[in-house]
Amino acid sequence: MGTSSYIYAIGKRTLAAIVCALTLLGCDSVIYDGEGDCSVNYRVKFRYDMNLKFADAFAREVESVTLYLLDGGGRVVWQRTESGEALGKEGYAMEVDVAPGTYDLLAWCGSTDKGSFRIPESASRKELTCTLMRESGTDGTGHIREDHDRLYHGYLPNQTFGDTEGIYTYVVPLVKNTNNVRVVLQQTSGERLDKKRFSFRIPAENGRMDWDNQLLPDEPVTYHAWHKQSATAGTALPDLPDAVTSVNAVIAELTTARLMVRDKSATVRSETGTNPPQLQPEELPEERKMRLTVRDNDTGKTVLSIPLVDYALLVKGEYRRDMDEQEFLDRMDEYNIVCVLGEGMRWVSMSINIHSWKMVWQNTGI
């Protein structure tokens, strides 16, 4: 090999080595992440542990996710909806394709088979509200007579989407906005109860939610029992022929939207015991607050009428975790209420069960 050819070969190898070294320096973090190139990847995960078990139930409960990325002016710069089996797989994350910057992450999630909620298509954050579909009554109120989809809301503000190569992962916490209320009426006399005899309802004003999950002004909405059944349980006792050995009951199920502290009775809210208690700005007037009502259709009389939020919060003291009242309501999603009826279908006692906790009240007015 001539001198010129030797110098050319050495120069070519040196140039290749320099290019290779520059490439390694530019992609060292990517190699660390195992990507093999200089790309930037954004991934968003979702977590639903705002429950009384303090365990992430996202994979088990959530079937559909719609994610919005919002810029500093509240404009939607990117959105995507994903649903199906992929959400239930371990490690699920939504891939996000957006320019580097700072964004707020907003999510509406849940099940979608019933079409219970409507979220408008919009490029503005303030219009990404959620409305519970309802029947319109002739009196200007709404009625929900069927079970509805589960609904979850998530918000993660002011997140930086970096421009340095690598994988960026963000986790959006979710709050569940739907609650199941199961009511059991029991008869002490052993008389069989007909499910058609009783009406169950919960009037409320919680059918519209803003982008930040706060309630918007709404028409009165009445939740009706979407399932009722008569049931009997008991055992025959030959040695006690006159004893009541069976329990007859009517079981009803209702589903409501988000429970809020604003529906707590003012008399309970007042800490000073002043009379009358001062109404807070966020509160509703007493006559418009959420109540569970059971009516005897045969007589037209009200069997039971209780402030649902008040009774739910009575159980809060049983839990040994520090949380405010709204967090407690958000963590609850199922209420089991048992009402024992005596003579004349008047309630004798009532209990509310939440997980393993039980509170019992006696009707001292009978």
What are the roles of these predicted feature ranges?
Residues T23-G26:
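C-terminal motif of bacterial Sec signal peptides marking the signal peptidase cleavage site
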Residues G2-L15:
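Bacterial N-terminal signal peptides that target proteins for export
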Residues W78-N177:
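Short, low-hydrophobicity acidic/polar segments
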Residues D33-L52, P173-Q186:
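A short, Gly/Thr-enriched small/hydrophobic beta-strand-prone motif that recurs across taxa
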Residues D28-Y32:
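Bacterial signal peptide processing site
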